[in-house]
């Protein structure tokens, strides 16, 4: 292998296979664009985003790591979320959970 070389498998790569997912309609009620990162606990996303928060507890965006979704002011869109895995403990963000889910 050459340093920096990529070894990419053929076909599509499925992210988060076999994990629980859900789709949620989200609206930006604020006056500025809002970006939510791939691993941000969606339940604790910006308060200007209007959606069924309780339904999203323990979920994050089902998008590739390191990417984000941007929602413009007044925009509404459907996003797919995926359940957190591992120990299912959430700390930080807006401090609404701070422990086990």
Curated annotation (Swiss-Prot):
Gene it is expressed from: ureB
Q: Which cysteines are joined by disulfide bonds?
A: none
Catalysed reaction equations from the record? urea + 2 H2O + H(+) = hydrogencarbonate + 2 NH4(+)
A single MF term (Gene Ontology): urease activity
PANTHER family linked to this entry: UREASE
Organism the protein comes from? Alcanivorax borkumensis (strain ATCC 700651 / DSM 11573 / NCIMB 13689 / SK2)
Q: Name one GO cellular component term.
A: urease complex
Q: Which UniProt keywords apply?
A: Cytoplasm, Hydrolase
Subcellular location field: Cytoplasm
Family the UniProt entry places it in = Belongs to the urease beta subunit family.
Q: Which domain of life is it from?
A: Bacteria
Q: Which GO terms describe its biological process?
A: urea catabolic process
Question: Which pathway does this chain act in?
Answer: Nitrogen metabolism; urea degradation; CO(2) and NH(3) from urea (urease route): step 1/1
Q: Might you give the EC number(s) for this enzyme?
A: 3.5.1.5
Subunit structure, as described in the record: Heterotrimer of UreA (gamma), UreB (beta) and UreC (alpha) subunits. Three heterotrimers associate to form the active enzyme.
Entry protein name? Urease subunit beta
- InterPro entries for the chain: Urease_beta-like, Urease_betasu_sf, Urease_subunit
């Amino acid at each position: 292998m050459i340093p920096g070389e990529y070894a990419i498998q053929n076909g599509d790569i499925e992210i988060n296979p076999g994990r629980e997912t859900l789709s949620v309609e989200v609206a930006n009620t604020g006056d500025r664009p809002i970006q939510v990162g791939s691993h941000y606990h969606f339940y604790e996303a910006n308060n200007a985003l209007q959606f069924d928060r309780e339904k999203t507890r323990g979920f994050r965006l089902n998008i590739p790591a390191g990417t984000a979704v941007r929602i413009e002011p007044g925009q509404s869109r459907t996003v797919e979320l995926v359940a957190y895995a591992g120990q299912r403990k959430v700390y930080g963000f807006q401090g609404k959970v701070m422990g086990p889910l």
